[in-house]
Every structure is written in C-alpha cells, then in structure tokens.
Amino acid sequence: MKIKINDYTKGEVIKIIREWTGLTQQDFGKSIGKSKPSIQAYELDKINYGIETLLKIAKKHNLTITIEKNK
C-alpha cells in the first residue's frame, strides 16, 4: 500500500500507518517506545512528532519513506 503524505495531516499519517500494522494505539506505542497517550495525541494532531519518530516507525514496521521531486 502507498500514500502520498502531502494529502494528509501528520496525525492522519500516523493513524494510517498504525492501522496498516493492525496494532492498538498502546501496542503501536510500545513498538516505538512511546505511550498510548502520545500516539493518541499524534493522531489528533495535538502534538508534533519529528522525522526521527517517523524513521523509527518506518524501520520498526518495514516501511519505506520516499521523497520525490514534483515535475
């Protein structure tokens, strides 16, 4: 599956990835060293996460992050 993250909020991106994994917020959080409240806050766009967190998620859940220049 593939998404264009420019079409989503940061929170929606985290939620989509978590749903792909089939994990609860608590289990997803544990998988990346974050708490359930942190994952909830990410998904609701209440707190920001950095590229380090996104890279950690990608590595842990076998995802590829691609940046492509628009034509």
Spans of model-derived segments:
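N-terminal flexible/basic segments that precede or flank functional cores
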Residues: 1-8, 62-64
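Short basic helix-loop element that most often maps to the first helix and adjoining turn
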Residues: 12-27, 31, 56
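Residue-level recognition of specific faces of alpha-helices
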Residues: 13, 38-41, 53
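Recognition helix of helix-turn-helix/homeodomain-like DNA-binding domains
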Residues: 33-47
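DNA major-groove recognition helix of helix-turn-helix/homeodomain DNA-binding modules
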Residues: 50-67
